[in-house]
Amino acid sequence: MTEPIEVLYFYRTKWGAHDEFMRLFRKNHWPILREQVGEGRFTDVHLATPRFHGDGRADWDIVVSITYRDWASIEEHSEAEIARRLFPDQDAYKAEEQRRFELLDAHWDVPVERRPLE
């Protein structure tokens, strides 16, 4: 399949950890995602958070949508190489990434298929 594939990455941060998670995401993960947009692996990346608390279920508080060029680009694994290039201090980078995931209660990925309404 050669059409773009959208995957939603849901995150639920622990109570009080949202700001720290976002800081670490912007510092360490966003540069890697941005690099992959520049390389053409991704055609779009955006992040969203709920504007309001809603009904209180709080299944997620952050969602990142990544549109991959195609199915083949999902199989490409260039994150580690990009991380080594962008973050020469790998010990600090890995510690901060571990901390970022310690701030989560849950994380899951959902490939979605857009459907025409007419």
Please give the residue ranges for each predicted region.
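Active-site-flanking beta-strand signature of metal-NTP-handling nucleotidyl enzymes
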Residues: 4-12, 63-64
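Short amphipathic alpha-helical segments
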Residues: 17-45
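A common structural junction motif
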Residues: 32-33, 82-88
